[in-house]
Amino acid sequence: MPKVGMEPLRRKALIDATISAIGERGSLDVTMSEIAGRAGVSSALAHHYFGAKDELLFATMRHILAELTIDMRRALQSAKSPRERVSAVVAVNFSDIQFQAQTIAAWLAFYVEAQKSSALRRLLKIYARRLHSNLMSGLTGILPRAEADSAAEATAAMIDGLYIRRALKDGVPNAATAIALVEDYLETKLGERQKQ
């Protein structure tokens, strides 16, 4: 008989194990059995909770996005100005939870898999829209809409690019450096606007 109340804990353990396994391999080439072993549960239980591996991968991506969303809401609520909102978005994207090797590897693996999976592609589109919207929530208070849109696109591209460099272990070594690079771009962009 299953232990009452264990399902949420086991689901979370399986999701964490998925991130860990993908991070170690650098790809989605992991088995349910391997993930279950890392989580300390049987393969049968992993299949019971998630069905197929694709469903577990989808749940893992949703979990990563949910963590990002929670942290983003908290950061945006404490921002007191449009400029602080933009900086909050940048900082959350490079937080300790998001900008660690295992999570970065998971992000990149999901990007690759989204080319084949409509469900993962949909999640990545949601992420991209939210990132753009969150950046625009600050930038439109500083720049005209068209310029804000362009700056949001460039900032999002920098964030994604810095993730790729970190995953390849080529370039940006840590979150502080990544934040500084993006903030430098923003200061340059916003400074140009103030000179006009």
Swiss-Prot record:
InterPro entries: BetI_C, DNA-bd_HTH_TetR-type_CS, Homeodomain-like_sf, HTH-type_TetR-like_transc_reg, HTH_TetR, Tet_transcr_reg_TetR-rel_C_sf, Tscrpt_rep_BetI
Presence of the UniProt keyword Transcription in the record: yes
Keywords linked to the UniProt accession: DNA-binding, Repressor, Transcription, Transcription regulation
Glycoprotein is among the record's keywords: no
One of the protein's GO biological processes: glycine betaine biosynthetic process from choline
Entry-linked HAMAP family: HTH_type_BetI
PANTHER family, per the entry: HTH-TYPE TRANSCRIPTIONAL REGULATOR BETI, HTH-TYPE TRANSCRIPTIONAL REGULATOR RUTR
UniProt name for this protein: HTH-type transcriptional regulator BetI
Lineage of producing organism: Bacteria, Pseudomonadati, Pseudomonadota, Alphaproteobacteria, Hyphomicrobiales
Gene: betI
